[in-house]
Amino acid sequence: MTSAQNESQALGDLAARQLANATKTVPQLSTITPRWLLHLLNWVPVEAGIYRVNRVVNPEQVAIKAEAGAGSEEPVPQTYVDYETSPREYTLRSISTLVDIHTRVSDLYSSPHDQIAQQLRLTIETIKERQELELINSPEYGLLAQATGRQTIQTLAGAPTPDDLDALITKVWKTPSFFLTHPLGIAAFGREATYRGVPPPVVSLFGPTQFITWHGIRLPSDKVPVEDGKTKFILVRTGEERQGVVGLFQPGLVGEQAPGLSVRFTGINQSAIATYLVTLYTSLAVLTDDALAVLDDVAVDQFHEYK
């Protein structure tokens, strides 16, 4: 009996598939990252899109006296705490885009996955990725731009060593919260620490996610740039109550989908294309200079030969 006759005796796979339903995933976007900075920052709501940071002028000159001994009659010093007359104000910045969806597509092809919902989901994910990039690299309000000269140090020998990170911790020694660096920076530090016989501990956070740590401070990878084989390590203290770094957002937006994020339907044009405006308002404030420090010119291309 020929193979053709065998095939004709039963329904074939190709024909049978025409009656079967396939399980379909939602669209997968490879540029989505964990965005640890957005998770680890403390977020503060602001009014009218403005956040004013009031600082004390010459804090070391505030005079307080401790009594030297019993019966001392030395005069009590007079003092007052002066404030900056022109404090820095942070204004929320917007990240926006228009999403176009043909009504025919959303009407006919929204099962099992809603086309409008998926278009907006992927757009919002991309906007949040851009938000994190700006929080680190923006020349106006990014972490790297707000680190002062006194809070920026150089590596001892190019590659990031435990001594380098210890020196960075001395700059943000009041309850530091976390490090930020590029994945290549994490790998470079792991090599140097292991080569010196002190491999960095690994802890589990946010479920199964593994983080390299140093002195208990987390090292999540992030959008810190790498240029010419060099990157940076950023150390941050977070929170208003700790005079640290805080993220800023505007609450109560029209069409709010998440803190500081709104989606608004703007209409349908003559080509039957529906348009949605997606906008995120964000910024980042450093309350005191010692809440942020940067290890600069970190080489990520140095390797060791183990014998």
From Swiss-Prot:
Keyword Acyltransferase: no
Stored Pfam families: SrpI-like
Keyword Transmembrane helix: no
InterPro entries, per the entry: Encap_f2a, SrpI-like
Keywords linked to the UniProt accession: Encapsulin nanocompartment
Compartments in which it is found: Encapsulin nanocompartment
A GO term from the CC aspect: encapsulin nanocompartment
Quaternary structure annotation from Swiss-Prot or TrEMBL: Homooligomeric. The encapsulin nanocompartment is formed by 60 subunits; monomers form pentamers which assemble to form shells. There are 12 charged pores where the pentamers meet as well as 3-fold axis channels and dimer channels.
Note: Dominant antigen for this bacteria, could possibly used in vaccine formulation and/or for diagnosis.
General function of this protein: Shell component of a type 2A encapsulin nanocompartment. Forms encapsulin nanocompartments about 24 nm in diameter from 60 monomers. Probably encapsulates at least cysteine desulfurase (CyD) and allows passage of cysteine into its interior, probably involved in sulfur metabolism.
Domain comment quoted from the record: Has 4 domains; an N-terminal arm not found in the type 1 subfamily, a discontinuous peripheral domain (P), an elongated loop (E) and the discontinuous axial domain (A).
Family under the similarity heading: Belongs to the encapsulin family. Family 2A subfamily.
Protein name in the entry: Type 2A encapsulin shell protein
Organism: Mycobacterium avium
Gene designation per UniProt: enc
